[in-house]
Amino acid sequence: MKKELLEVFDNQFPDRDYTIEIVNPEFTSVCPKTGLPDFGTITLRYVPDKVCIELKSLKYYYLEFRNAGIFYENITNTILDHMISALHPRTLTVTTEWKARGGITETVTASYSSADKA
């Protein structure tokens, strides 16, 4: 996945804590074991610092996963790592919710806080 696709813009309120939630209900990837498509919802929830994510670039970034054979856990943590690199947010949580396969659903959540790094 090309994290270079992610673009940002200046946060107009960097002195204020506020939460941005972005939901993509049409995320697709491929199961690396079966080659079958996986369908899920990706939710990003973050408190920005100096910059915010530009949504069109995020859309194209997500499309990079469409034909990739990758496990749910890897998707969630890859998105988290790439978003941290692009945004340097105060906090960030990535939640991926996957449609049922064989009657089983899965939800993966990964979080980051800049306060933990201080």
From Swiss-Prot:
Which parts of the chain are coiled coil? none
Write out the similarity annotation. Answer: Belongs to the GTP cyclohydrolase I family. QueF type 1 subfamily.
Q: Which organism is it from?
A: Prosthecochloris aestuarii (strain DSM 271 / SK 413)
Q: Please write the reaction equations for the catalytic activity of this protein.
A: 7-aminomethyl-7-carbaguanine + 2 NADP(+) = 7-cyano-7-deazaguanine + 2 NADPH + 3 H(+)
Q: Where does substrate bind?
A: 53-55, 72-73
The record's principal subcellular location, in a coarse class, is cytoplasm
Active site per database record: 31, 38
What is this protein's function?
A: Catalyzes the NADPH-dependent reduction of 7-cyano-7-deazaguanine (preQ0) to 7-aminomethyl-7-deazaguanine (preQ1).
Transmembrane ranges?
Answer: none
The cellular location(s) given in this protein's UniProt record come to: Cytoplasm
SUPFAM superfamilies tied to this protein = Tetrahydrobiopterin biosynthesis enzymes-like
Q: GO molecular function terms here?
A: preQ1 synthase activity
> Listed GO cellular component terms?
cytoplasm
Q: What is its EC number?
A: 1.7.1.13
Q: In which pathway does it act?
A: tRNA modification; tRNA-queuosine biosynthesis
Q: Could you tell me which InterPro entries the record lists for this protein?
A: GTP-CH-I_C/QueF, NADPH_dep_7-cyano-7-deazaG_red, QueF, QueF_type1
Q: Which UniProt keywords apply?
A: Cytoplasm, NADP, Oxidoreductase, Queuosine biosynthesis
Q: What is this protein called in UniProt?
A: NADPH-dependent 7-cyano-7-deazaguanine reductase
Q: Name one GO biological process term.
A: queuosine biosynthetic process
